[in-house]
């Protein structure tokens, strides 16, 4: 019964205000998601944000090594492979961030003494990479059917030298920015699950960025919902 | 009897203390452990510092060497941090290549140096395009009792303030560098970033400077690095059993 269960769910999210240059405020780049594209992993997803693309695969719940097993919950592992070269310390740090975000939402206690592995491959990097990785990981976990208490999404924002906020920055905008902040938000109450920042900023700017990210996450969650509805609907 | 209860139900034991707004070691929720700093203890290093935050001990040694700058930044030196968590400091670490925690801590320190601009990389330039200083900062944890990131940031800052670089001139005839060990000068430290770590308990309580046990029992941790002007250099919220709202 190995039929082609290749359900493409290519949805275009509504664009912000037209193409580049994006104005300050809340326009995210155009994004797309495709699920169930790999045959080996239990779940897989490819998430595109503008030109940034990440492919995620999830294996689990599966057998775990005795040294790594936790008696009352699932052991979550994240492997992030960069586009070029061998994974380094920066990848390890990002893996830790993604893993902790996933651990906060995955109901690990339903599958004790098992392992859930999320493998992320960077296909192209054009800014907001960590946010794209988080989105791809979430979609892949949903595709694998791993029980979760909420969905999560990643939103990146950049602050340039005069304090203007740009959501979902491109790599050029990230390079020129004074600070780049990435947040992971959950779908139930838009609470902050993880944050990772680069650069100097004041605490009022932090609050502004967080508020903008929470507003933007509405779009991302709506996109997830539409994408999944399209995939599972009969028509 | 209290010791028995602590072994069987560590979280409940802890909650009893938190209800009274204090912790088992007698500290308040917002109180830091006694901090001791010892500067310049390693004579063979160009700069060193030993920091003790309660029981957590981190030593930082800085060695300066020559290097050729990269072609896209010919007037910038390098600062290379490395955090080592040897089996000496805690039974949870094994000998061998650096584990995940050490790599994450190294990346964190590298981010703090980069974001807070603690040293202007141009200050480390000797001769643009030919010779620059590279500062290898090795942070070794001697005793792990929680809050390693704060201790490392502090040790790094103290050691960098202690670094003395000799004067270097390039001899035009031989094109070799001449080091004058008698004339040494301190580094120009532009900002003083300070890291503060918090542990989150049951989504509601925030305690400062968690010990090893507290980190293990907490539902999440959060580290904020600020400089003197009150600007945040880093907001590191990696671990969380659950989420919390900011406002």
Curated annotation (Swiss-Prot), chain A:
Residues 1-24 are annotated as: Disordered. InterPro entries: ExoRNase_PH_dom1, ExoRNase_PH_dom2, ExoRNase_PH_dom2_sf, PNPase/RNase_PH_dom_sf, Ribosomal_Su5_D2-typ_SF, RNase_PH. One of its GO terms (cellular component) is cytoplasmic exosome (RNase complex). It is found in: Nucleus, Nucleolus; Cytoplasm; Nucleus. The modification Phosphoserine is found at residue 20. The keyword Metal-binding does not apply. Changing residue 148 to T: In CABAC; uncertain significance; no detectable effect on interaction with EXOSC3, EXOSC9 and EXOSC10, when assayed in a heterologous system. Keywords: Cytoplasm, Disease variant, DNA-binding, Exosome, Intellectual disability, Nucleus, Phosphoprotein, rRNA processing. Residues 1-13 have a biased composition (Basic and acidic residues). Highly expressed in a variety of hematopoietic and epithelial tumor cell lines, but not in normal hematopoietic tissues or other normal tissue, with the exception of testis. It holds the Pfam family RNase_PH. Transmembrane segments: none annotated. It comes from the Eukaryota. GO terms for molecular function: 3'-5'-RNA exonuclease activity; DNA binding; RNA binding. Non-catalytic component of the RNA exosome complex which has 3'->5' exoribonuclease activity and participates in a multitude of cellular RNA processing and degradation events. In the nucleus, the RNA exosome complex is involved in proper maturation of stable RNA species such as rRNA, snRNA and snoRNA, in the elimination of RNA processing by-products and non-coding 'pervasive' transcripts, such as antisense RNA species and promoter-upstream transcripts (PROMPTs), and of mRNAs with processing defects, thereby limiting or excluding their export to the cytoplasm. Homodimer. Component of the RNA exosome core complex (Exo-9), composed of EXOSC1, EXOSC2, EXOSC3, EXOSC4, EXOSC5, EXOSC6, EXOSC7, EXOSC8 and EXOSC9; within the complex interacts with EXOSC3, EXOSC8, and EXOSC9. The catalytically inactive RNA exosome core complex (Exo-9) associates with the catalytic subunit EXOSC10/RRP6. Exo-9 may associate with DIS3 to form the nucleolar exosome complex, or DIS3L to form the cytoplasmic exosome complex. Belongs to the RNase PH family. It is linked to Cerebellar ataxia, brain abnormalities, and cardiac conduction defects: An autosomal recessive disorder characterized by global developmental delay, impaired intellectual development and speech delay that are observed in most patients. Disease manifestations are variable and include infantile-onset hypotonia, poor motor development, poor feeding and overall growth, and ataxic gait due to cerebellar ataxia. Additional variable features are dysarthria, nystagmus, variable ocular anomalies, spasticity, hyperreflexia, and non-specific dysmorphic features. This is Exosome complex component RRP46. The gene is EXOSC5.
């Amino acid at each position: 019964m190995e039929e082609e269960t290749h359900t493409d769910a290519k949805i275009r999210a509504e664009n912000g205000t037209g193409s580049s240059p994006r104005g300050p405020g809340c326009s995210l780049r155009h994004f797309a998601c495709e699920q169930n594209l790999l045959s080996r992993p239990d779940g897989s997803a490819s998430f595109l944000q503008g030109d940034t693309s990440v492919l995620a695969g999830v294996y689990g719940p599966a057998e775990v090594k005795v040294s790594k097993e936790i008696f009352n919950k699932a052991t979550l592992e994240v492997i992030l492979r960069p586009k070029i070269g061998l994974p380094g310390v920066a990848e390890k740090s990002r893996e830790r961030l993604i893993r902790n975000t996933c651990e906060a939402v995955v109901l690990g206690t339903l599958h004790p003494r098992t392992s859930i592995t999320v493998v992320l491959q960077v296909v192209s990097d054009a800014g907001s990479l960590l946010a794209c990785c988080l989105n791809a990981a979430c979609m892949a976990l949903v595709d694998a059917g791993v029980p979760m208490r909420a969905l999560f999404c990643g939103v990146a924002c950049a602050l340039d030298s005069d304090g203007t906020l740009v959501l979902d920055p491109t790599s050029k905008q990230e390079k020129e920015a004074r600070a780049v902040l990435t947040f992971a938000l959950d779908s139930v109450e838009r609470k902050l699950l993880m944050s990772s920042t680069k650069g100097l900023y004041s605490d009022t700017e932090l609050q502004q960025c967080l508020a903008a990210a929470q507003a933007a996450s509405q779009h991302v969650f709506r996109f997830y919902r539409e994408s999944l509805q399209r995939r599972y609907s009969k028509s | 009897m209290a010791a028995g209860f602590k072994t069987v139900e560590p979280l409940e034991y802890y909650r009893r203390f938190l209800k009274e707004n204090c912790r088992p070691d007698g500290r308040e929720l917002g109180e830091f452990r006694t901090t001791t700093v010892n500067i310049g203890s390693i004579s063979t290093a160009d700069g060193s510092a030993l920091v003790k935050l309660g029981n957590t001990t981190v030593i930082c040694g800085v060695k300066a060497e020559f290097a050729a700058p990269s072609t896209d930044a010919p007037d910038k030196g390098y600062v290379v941090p490395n955090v080592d968590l040897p089996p000496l400091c805690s039974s949870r670490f094994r000998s061998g290549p650096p584990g995940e925690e050490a790599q994450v801590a190294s990346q964190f320190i590298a981010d703090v140096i980069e974001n807070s601009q603690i040293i202007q990389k141009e200050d480390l330039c000797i001769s643009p395009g030919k010779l620059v200083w590279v500062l290898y900062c090795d942070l070794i944890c001697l005793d792990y009792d929680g809050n390693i990131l704060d201790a490392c940031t502090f040790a790094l800052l103290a050691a960098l303030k202690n670094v003395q670089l000799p004067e270097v001139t390039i001899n035009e005839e031989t094109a070799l560098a001449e080091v004058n060990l008698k004339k040494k000068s301190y580094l120009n430290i532009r900002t003083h970033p300070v890291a503060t770590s918090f542990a989150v308990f049951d989504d509601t309580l925030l305690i400062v400077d968690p010990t090893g046990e507290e980190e293990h029992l907490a539902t999440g941790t959060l580290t904020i690095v600020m400089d003197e002007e009150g600007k945040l250099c880093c907001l590191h919220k990696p671990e969380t059993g659950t989420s919390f709202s900011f406002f």
